[in-house]
Amino acid sequence: MSVKFIEASDEDAIEISQILEDWAKSNHEIPLAHNNDERADYGRWLLEHTSVTMIHNSSGVVGFLALEKHIIQGLYIKKDFQGFGFGQAAIIFAQKQFEELRLWVFQSNIGAQKFYQRLGFQIVEKSDGEDNDYRLPDIFYCWKST
């Protein structure tokens, strides 16, 4: 697997918005709390307030990682590229930058829970989702370098 990490620029906003839109459409258990314009706004917010890294393979963009210091605000891999190690490579990329990483995962997203636990993340707390946009129960994870 060939993977490159390239710092995102304003020109990546459309690609980020499309990845977010595709994610929202493919996750049927998660209600569409945001319309396409709101997801585009969120993509722009990520570019302005976090460090966004585009994940590339030999044919182009396969996803992105958004970090706000040591907090993972988003790791999105296009559906056709999931299961090929791009997400794991992105986490390893982030782990090389920080001694601790934190993130929230929806409790309904069993695949993501298994993914992060396999990479050494530990559950810190569970919530009823009152504080997230989707109002879905979620889990707060933390990884610490050993």
Regions found by a protein language model. Give the residues of each.
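Conserved N-terminal entry element of GNAT/NAT acetyltransferase domains
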Residues: 1-11, 146
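Conserved GNAT-fold acetyl-CoA-binding loop/helix
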Residues: 10, 17-43
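Conserved beta-hairpin
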Residues: 50-63
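Conserved donor-binding loop and adjoining core beta-sheet/short helix segment
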Residues: 62-73
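A short, internal acetyl-CoA/4′-phosphopantetheine-binding micro-motif in the GNAT/acyltransferase core
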Residues: 72-82, 105-106
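Conserved acetyl-CoA pyrophosphate-binding loop and the N-cap/start of the following alpha-helix
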Residues: 80-81, 85-93
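C-terminal "cap" of GNAT-fold acetyltransferases
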Residues: 102, 106-113, 119, 125-146
